Amino acid sequence: VTAAGRAAARLAAWRPHAAAVYGSGLWALPEGARVEDEVPYDALGWPAGAVPGHQYVVRLAVVPGDAGRELRLALACGRPHLYEGWTEEELETPVRALAAAGVTRLVLTNSTGALRPPAAPDQAVVCSGVVDLQRPPAGEVPERLVVCRDEDAARVAGALGAAAVPGAGTYVAVCGPQFETPAEVTWLGRYGDVVGMSAAPEARAAAATGVECCLLALVANVAAAVSSHEDVLSAGGRLAGLLAAGLVPAVLARWPDLLEG
């Protein structure tokens, strides 16, 4: 058995109720969580990028729940990006590996830019779909990947209260690494509410492996009002707090029967 195989077996033995992939600067643990194990991406054979704000480690954490029940989470703290030179297949590796380890529920998170109201900084937009502009469109309209049903996204947004924009949103995935110009923001706003440089490969891998999803796009800035990755990371501390408070409520709202039985 290879080292990567042994590391993958640790994930499978953990039997998480759900997993989450954390975006730039968003690695804060859920409130009340304790970490019981850590597995570096390298040990799993997963791609580990070089962009600041990502830790490239899977944390296996437990969050105490009601009636003595505990929520087991696999938290993938960091993601590689298309603009770093990774292939789509490589970017799908973490989600496919989590699925192979028995994960059937996944929360994707990222730091994102607002394209149009009501999306605004320091709020979450719970997205039911991803418009994939990282791939050339087959026709006149870009491909839209389904993340979850609109009603599921709206239920999660409701559980987050004032921290989230009500209802379901749409995320637009672009290649990067450059940030959007005002003209591009106007055009992209025809397709979605928020924009970022991730999520499409993961959503595609989740659909292919039967993993149920939820996408929390945490708004770091108004698109076209940011000039560097450092600007995004400066908002990360605020957004990490939002995610620390909101991840477990989001998971339990998306899958209400998760801890039953």
Named regions from a protein language model:
Residues 1-147:
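Metabolite-binding pocket within alpha/beta catalytic cores that recognizes anionic/polar moieties
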Residues 147-190:
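Active-site rim beta-loop-alpha module in soluble metabolic enzymes
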Residues 104-105, 193, 212:
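Short acidic/polar active-site loop segments enriched in Thr and Asp
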Residues 10, 155-164, 242, 246-254:
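Generic non-transmembrane alpha-helical segments
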Residues 98-102, 189, 207:
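Non-catalytic positions within long, well-ordered alpha-helices that form the structural scaffold/packing
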Residues 173, 194-198:
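Catalytic beta/alpha-barrel core
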Residues 223-261:
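His/Asp/Glu-rich mid-to-C-terminal helical/loop segments that flank catalytic regions of hydrolases
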